[in-house]
Amino acid sequence: MLERAKRLAEHAHQGQRDKGGHPYILHPMRVMQHCETEEEKIVAVLHDVIEDTEVTLEELKKEGFSEEIRNTLVCLTHREGEGYMEYIERICQNPLAVRVKYADLQDNMDLSRIPNPTEKDYARLEKYQKAKVRIEEAMKG
């Protein structure tokens, strides 16, 4: 299933670029490397497909991804009009989402991938730091 997730993510993110101008698929692949279980790795690779691509939950179901994986991907999808910390609190209710979001934040907080960080990048880093503290609390139980 992990190989299927990688192929699906590569296809879905094709042509997308990150804030540093690099192919976007590198981000979910790096997040995956910070995860331990196969389930975490699958969610990591797919964590932005619902929010940032045309992939639907129905397609993921047809591809054979479990209900738990699909529910976790829904949990990791930032809803329109939802405050960022509200989104983080929602993630804190799902242990699998918590573990993947922690890895996601670690990668998002690495400003070395952005050639010339701006004030906006540093403000985003501060927001991510607050989220990371809350996610770490959730990880401790």
Language model features: what each stretch is:
Residues M1-G141:
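Active-site helical microenvironments for divalent-metal-assisted chemistry
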